[in-house]
């Protein structure tokens, strides 16, 4: 997207704060319906990040698959549960939550240091081969596959991890 630098920076900060607030809402809100809507906010902000990065196809796939299908499925599953049990005995902080948050924070810090210290361009899967690929001989689905396995490999994998964590969290909330 061709935006001026101050507008682009403002949108990055705005979408980043939306991601942080939505993620906190998924984890901290006691009502699973509100958590599912917060997950929808996180997924929409992620697709808007892709639009800012000029990855329109990945943004459309994010909206259609994750927000349009999976998040709606989670909301339907939560709606069939008994909702009155989530308002009884709600304690914001317990000892187990503190231990879990310390483990999560330490994992997050180790992931951030690993990601920042890694040279992603030296990995063979994130670089294109030296062969010249004729665009005329490839179908659209082959071009999408090449882009997902080269240009958008890291964002695609990060999105899959975020979705996996969200689904595990939804299952954990549904079992309680």
Swiss-Prot record:
Reaction(s) catalysed (UniProt annotation): a plastoquinone + NADH + (n+1) H(+)(in) = a plastoquinol + NAD(+) + n H(+)(out); a plastoquinone + NADPH + (n+1) H(+)(in) = a plastoquinol + NADP(+) + n H(+)(out)
Quaternary data: NDH is composed of at least 16 different subunits, 5 of which are encoded in the nucleus.
Predominant cellular place of this UniProt entry's protein: plastid
InterPro entries on file: NAD(P)H-Q_Oxidoreduct_6, NADH_UbQ/plastoQ_OxRdtase_su6, Nuo/plastoQ_OxRdtase_6_NuoJ
Organism: Solanum lycopersicum (Tomato)
Protein name: NAD(P)H-quinone oxidoreductase subunit 6, chloroplastic
Domain of life: Eukaryota
Localisation per UniProt entry: Plastid, Chloroplast thylakoid membrane
GO cellular component: chloroplast thylakoid membrane
Transmembrane spans: 10-30, 32-52, 61-81, 92-112, 152-172
Secretion signal, residue range per the UniProt entry: none
Pfam families in alphabetical order: Oxidored_q3
EC number: 7.1.1.-
Gene: ndhG
Keywords carried by this UniProt record: Chloroplast, Membrane, NAD, NADP, Plastid, Plastoquinone, Quinone, Thylakoid, Translocase, Transmembrane, Transmembrane helix, Transport
